[in-house]
Amino acid sequence: MSRRGTAEEKTAKSDPIYRNRLVNMLVNRILKHGKKSLAYQIIYRAVKKIQQKTETNPLSVLRQAIRGVTPDIAVKARRVGGSTHQVPIEIGSTQGKALAIRWLLGASRKRPGRNMALKLSSELVDAAKGSGDAIRKKEETHKMAEANRAFAHFR
């Protein structure tokens, strides 16, 4: 038995302007090659664009988009007796938010155009409305989990 204690879970810090953890999570996921100031620029421009498009609080749109994309359940590959099964597992809130952010950024990167701030703002607005590529990805994941419900006892 190990004498070592369990590691404490790190809490995400909030960003300097909006004092919001979700914004900081987005910044850390969009970050490439250590260019954090550029990541902040992209996020803040996207938030400004959301403000212009919807004329509502952009942080509530962001929260709504992430809540809409966050999956409740996912599938995990598990090897049982020589064959691999897709086993549905429940997802915690932190992991769900991380997945949602990853899907939102992936969907916005796939959008046509060159300006990432514009693409991200469009994807966030679409996700808040209940459409877009990230929402489709969530529904796909839920369908996979439902289809493989028979393997739920393999956990």
Curated annotation (Swiss-Prot):
Keyword terms, alphabetized: Chloroplast, Plastid, Ribonucleoprotein, Ribosomal protein, RNA-binding, rRNA-binding
Matching NCBIfam families: rpsG_bact
Keyword Ribosomal protein: yes
Protein name: Small ribosomal subunit protein uS7c
Subunit structure: Part of the 30S ribosomal subunit.
CC terms in the record's Gene Ontology section: chloroplast; small ribosomal subunit
Protein's UniProt keywords contain Metal-binding: no
Family: Belongs to the universal ribosomal protein uS7 family.
GO BP: translation
Natural source organism: Asarum canadense (Wild ginger)
Cell compartment(s), UniProt: Plastid, Chloroplast
CDD domains, alphabetized: uS7_Chloroplast (cd14871)
Biological role: One of the primary rRNA binding proteins, it binds directly to 16S rRNA where it nucleates assembly of the head domain of the 30S subunit.
Organism lineage: Eukaryota, Viridiplantae, Streptophyta, Embryophyta, Tracheophyta
